[in-house]
């Protein structure tokens, strides 16, 4: 079960040209259905993730962006999605990275065991469905750990190759984040200060 994230500038630029219009764009949901997934129509599905060009790039209003992503994640949490699929790179980036920020600010984590909800672009989802190696797709660079999702989907992967480049050289590993552990394991809680 997964929520498609399609309420963004991609759906709004040419609202009459898209299948389903800007309010109910169907292309992403159709891809999910065709690949055997089950879409979730959660209450804030059509709400902006906060990346909007004006909101983040021009005005750099981080508070607005975090608040919008928080609202969307809270809205989809009761549905317990396996992962989120986005057609916009901004949505994918924000819904992935803001989970860490929300965990630090609010002490709230999402997903199975509080480990976060993986967020994939539709290209990454297509690559996995077509049998590409997840590390070749760059999935190790996500903020939220993708291994539990890969296991649930039955996708073979080599944990030892996660941070190796094409020629077997180590490409670097991101530092652990609060999203990949339980709230009780966090070093500090901002609200408690």
Language-model region placement:
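Iron-sulfur cluster-binding electron-transfer modules in prokaryotic oxidoreductases
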Residues: 1-193
